[in-house]
């Protein structure tokens, strides 16, 4: 669980996302409250439920990017899902309970990786011993002491990488092919249980394999680490981590909102909302690792709400998202900042890509300003897709350089206002062309 302060979280988000201070503050406070709750007396802790968040804003302004970055900062089980993938039970689509099952899988993976990291040094020592037993067979027969001079010499060579290319034959667990069982829609849990049941049938088989020592060492280290990790303890802690610290981000929630004026039958849109409701307000979901309570899982939802309004969601679901954050559309200045100030901006990405072929890409401020203006104008005249427009415009701008990069090796390409206008101005001014090309 991350112990970063709200200011630190916002500062980290600022490195990747321009503007949207309201949304950043909301998720930062929500994440910090997860940590605060863990410090509270256990009797009161159970009564403190998370304040779920609804983010509203047009496409391409940073809603999904905030979720992606939050996942890396949270240091807690985190899953992002699309609301459109789920349908009411009885229709074609995924069962909403699979959200919790997937969250638990993430928690188990995180917990196991953390435990493997702790025992890594012991596992590496055990793997080295197994390789040395193959290299110096006499050590196994008792003719020489286990820590003989020869063994120490070989251990030193092994650690220095001098033996990496030597081939040896070792016994390793035979990884049998995974039995794939295709369950019907909404029956993913049953299919998972059947897979687990079949995988446990029969004894573990071992097989002799001839491998380079470098590969054998990695394989044996993973095998030894698996023996040192207590799987039952991993499952118990992972379930608790998912229940107490889990975060679920549901994107495109507006797509399951039913518009009041819409006629005809909406394919179970309200049904999806009603199925999500118990999950958000607190229920118990059965997973292959055990029962999971969702009372303290934090839910963050987002949607553009172009056609529907937040008030079109069923009232019970609206009430479960007390924190509403509206994200603003991006301005020309925001586009410029995205191109120049973010940690891994498109400008830096293209410069790094073309540098691999010896081409130096130099962006001057006037060129970036003109590029931002063109992206903004195209968004205004056609569909507003926010910052995603910059990717389309940049790809078109550097199409020629990217194609001829091998011929331009050793040269510097200067991207100024004239360069941008020469390649994009005619396209951006022609609405038909910009609609289909930019």
Curated annotation (Swiss-Prot):
- Say yes or no: keyword ATP-binding present: yes
- Listed binding positions for ATP are 18, 60-65, 251, 316, 388
- CDD domains tied to this protein: RecA-like_HslU
One GO biological-process annotation of the entry reads:
proteolysis involved in protein catabolic process
Membrane-spanning segments: none
Q: Which cysteines are joined by disulfide bonds?
A: none
The keyword Chaperone belongs to this UniProt entry's keyword annotation: yes
What subcellular compartments does it reside in?
A: Cytoplasm
Record's keyword terms, sorted: ATP-binding, Chaperone, Cytoplasm, Nucleotide-binding, Stress response
> Function of this protein?
ATPase subunit of a proteasome-like degradation complex; this subunit has chaperone activity. The binding of ATP and its subsequent hydrolysis by HslU are essential for unfolding of protein substrates subsequently hydrolyzed by HslV. HslU recognizes the N-terminal part of its protein substrates and unfolds these before they are guided to HslV for hydrolysis.
Quaternary state and interactors: A double ring-shaped homohexamer of HslV is capped on each side by a ring-shaped HslU homohexamer. The assembly of the HslU/HslV complex is dependent on binding of ATP.
| Family designation | Belongs to the ClpX chaperone family. HslU subfamily.
Write down the PANTHER family for this protein, in alphabetical order. Answer: ATP-DEPENDENT CLP PROTEASE ATP-BINDING SUBUNIT CLPX-LIKE, MITOCHONDRIAL-RELATED (PTHR48102), ATP-DEPENDENT PROTEASE ATPASE SUBUNIT HSLU (PTHR48102:SF3)
| Name of the protein in question | ATP-dependent protease ATPase subunit HslU
This protein's species is Paracidovorax citrulli (strain AAC00-1)
């Amino acid at each position: 669980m991350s112990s970063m302060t709200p200011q630190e979280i916002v500062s980290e988000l600022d490195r990747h996302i321009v503007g949207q201070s309201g949304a950043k503050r909301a998720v930062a406070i929500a994440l910090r409250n997860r940590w605060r709750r863990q410090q509270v007396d256990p009797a009161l802790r159970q009564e403190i439920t998370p304040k779920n968040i609804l983010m509203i804003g047009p496409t391409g302004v940073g809603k999904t990017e905030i979720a992606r970055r939050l996942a890396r900062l949270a240091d807690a089980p985190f899953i992002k899902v699309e609301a459109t993938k789920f349908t009411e039970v009885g229709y074609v689509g995924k069962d909403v309970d699979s959200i919790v099952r997937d969250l638990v899988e993430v928690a188990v993976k995180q917990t196991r990786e953390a435990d493997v990291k702790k025992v890594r040094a012991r596992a590496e020592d055990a793997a080295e011993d197994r390789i040395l037993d193959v290299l110096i067979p006499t050590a196994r027969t008792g003719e020489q002491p286990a820590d003989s001079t020869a063994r120490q010499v070989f251990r030193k060579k092994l650690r220095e990488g001098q033996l990496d290319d030597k081939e040896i034959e070792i016994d390793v667990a035979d990884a049998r092919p995974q039995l794939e069982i295709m369950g019907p829609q909404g029956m993913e849990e049953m299919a998972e249980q059947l897979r687990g049941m079949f995988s446990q049938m029969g004894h573990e088989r071992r097989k002799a394999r001839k491998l380079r020592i470098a590969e054998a060492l990695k394989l044996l280290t993973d095998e030894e680490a698996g023996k040192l990790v207590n799987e039952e303890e991993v499952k118990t802690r992972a379930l608790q981590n998912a229940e107490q610290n889990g975060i679920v981000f549901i994107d495109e929630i507006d797509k399951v909102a039913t518009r009041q004026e819409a006629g005809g039958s909406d394919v179970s849109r309200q049904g999806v909302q009603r199925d999500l409701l118990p999950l958000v307000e607190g229920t118990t979901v059965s997973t292959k690792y055990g029962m999971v309570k969702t009372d303290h899982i934090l839910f963050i939802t987002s949607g553009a709400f172009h056609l529907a309004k937040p008030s079109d969601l069923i009232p019970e679901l609206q009430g479960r998202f007390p924190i509403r954050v509206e994200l603003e559309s991006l301005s020309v200045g925001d586009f410029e900042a995205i191109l120049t100030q973010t940690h891994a901006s498109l400008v830096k990405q293209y410069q790094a890509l073309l540098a691999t072929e010896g081409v130096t890409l130099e962006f001057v401020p006037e060129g970036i300003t003109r590029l931002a203006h063109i992206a903004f104008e195209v968004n205004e005249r056609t569909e507003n897709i926010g910052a995603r427009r910059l990717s389309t415009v940049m790809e078109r701008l550097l199409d020629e350089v990217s194609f001829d990069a091998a011929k331009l090796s050793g040269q510097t390409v200067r991207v100024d206002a004239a360069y941008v206008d020469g390649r994009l101005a005619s396209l951006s001014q022609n609405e038909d062309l910009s609609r289909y090309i930019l």
